Amino acid sequence: MMLQRSCIVLFFSLFLLVPQMVFSMLNRTLLLIPHPDPELVAYQVQWKVNASITRRQALDTTDQAGSTPCITGNPIDDCWKCDPNWPNNRQGLADCGIGFGQYALGGKGGQFYFVTDSSDDDAVNPKPGTLRYGVIQEEPLWIVFPSNMMIKLKQELIFNSYKTLDGRGANVHIVGGGCITLQYVSNIIIHNIHIHHCYQSGNTNVRSSPTHYGFRTKSDGDGISIFGSKDIWIDHCSLSRCKDGLIDAVMGSTGITISNNFFSHHNEVMLLGHSDHYEPDSGMQVTIAFNHFGEKLIQRMPRCRRGYIHVVNNDFTQWEMYAIGGSGNPTINSQGNRYTAPTNPFAKEVTKRVETPDGDWKGWNWRSEGDILVNGAFFVASGEGAEMRYEKAYSVEPKSASFITQITFHSGVLGVGGRNNNLGMWTTTGSEGTSGLDSYNDYTDEMSGAGSTNRLSFSVLVFLLSSISYLVVFTSSTQMFML
């Protein structure tokens, strides 16, 4: 009996040695399950777009008073903007998502948290009322801004799960160190926020929850970094001039929708996928819809590795190198976009297979369906039998490309301040003003902001779990022996 008790005590002691974050990380990683039928999700997006356009056309025909109808043809905006009572039903926004990120709940069902303090003086002990204090809480929160504010971050803003950043009704800018980090979390909605002039930070402690803070290595300086996360929706934001990417999603992240955003003044706009050889990124599924890729963009709109990427009804107004690139055999489904090529005769191609021989990418699944190609733009499709596989008899066709101006007219931040970031307020030299134009390197194995306290090597994890299993078996055997 004494031996049995000793084993039980040892079992629980070893169990307590395993940090809570390891189990949290393990559980979240196991839940990064892709949708079983991505083509169905793509079909549903196009169906919703065409349904909104049909309603808009019907209103144009029947409207006798000459007033402008609310319906725009954009199914996300039509879902909430047509409700005159939306300020009193803010959480209804969570029901308006489309695509792979449509299940992002954000803080729906939770309390409202009001950001009343724009300061960010302490990344370990943030003050109540600050944005940092709100995003680290455990419970669902719908975070709103009662006034205009400029939030200058000192370090990465690390989110906890089930949070909505709702900037409607205010002019909210997030700039500085970091900026936004979504690491091993789920159910995040970021809506109507200016995000720009983000630079590298780190090599210090940062709090990620009310009960945990840890040392963070140097971040890459992304506008929004999505790392091992799911059910993420980024809508109606204006992003520009960050050190690395404007939005980067890596390490098996999936269930993401990036919609109605305005991108400008940046080099490497969007990276989807950690590396060509990182298997979990094969399950990455991202919808990129109704965005305006505006002036002074160079490349990566997006740059994909593995996964399934649905690019639908976006307006690409020139690029300097290419618009959509990839490696590692991603599936790219381009539907109903408008691609306007630059004047450079050597940069007319929409697509780029990055550092991949022709013989390797010929079988990759890249298609263009219903896209509008302007100023000599051309899309190089690939995939054996792609036309037969992709042009099946859908009842929905991407006819909405001709409505691109209408669908993307309100891209970026709505209301106060407009969609353009007020670039005149910022210098273009030094760490806070780095535009990102000097960053051409791809991601390396040293991922941004991944602090050592948040990681436990796989071998150590296996050892601990194996030890626990061994003790359970040993205890049972001892009990049987004593009987």
From Swiss-Prot:
Supply one GO molecular-function term.
metal ion binding
Give the pathway.
Glycan metabolism; pectin degradation; 2-dehydro-3-deoxy-D-gluconate from pectin: step 2/5
Leader peptide range in chain numbering: 1-24
Cofactor: how and how many bound: Binds 1 Ca(2+) ion. Required for its activity.
Which top-level group of life is the source organism from?
Answer: Eukaryota
The EC number(s) this enzyme carries: 4.2.2.2
InterPro entries from the xrefs?
AmbAllergen (IPR018082), Pec_lyase (IPR002022), Pectin_lyas_fold (IPR012334), Pectin_lyase_fold/virulence (IPR011050), PEL (IPR045032)
Report the Pfam families cross-referenced here: Pectate_lyase_4 (PF00544)
Q: Keywords of this protein's UniProt record, alphabetized? A: Calcium, Glycoprotein, Lyase, Metal-binding, Signal
Task: List the carbohydrate attachment sites.
Answer: N27, N50
UniProt binding sites for Ca(2+): D220, D244, D248
Cofactor(s) it depends on:
Ca(2+)
Q: Which Gene3D superfamilies match?
A: Single-stranded right-handed beta-helix, Pectin lyase-like
What are the positions of the active site? R300
| Enzyme kind, highest EC tier | lyase
GO biological process annotation, one example: pectin catabolic process
Q: Which reaction does it catalyse?
A: Eliminative cleavage of (1->4)-alpha-D-galacturonan to give oligosaccharides with 4-deoxy-alpha-D-galact-4-enuronosyl groups at their non-reducing ends
- For the keyword Calcium, the answer is yes
Into which family does the record put it?
Answer: Belongs to the polysaccharide lyase 1 family.
From the Swiss-Prot or TrEMBL record, give the protein name.
Answer: Probable pectate lyase 12
Organism of derivation: Arabidopsis thaliana
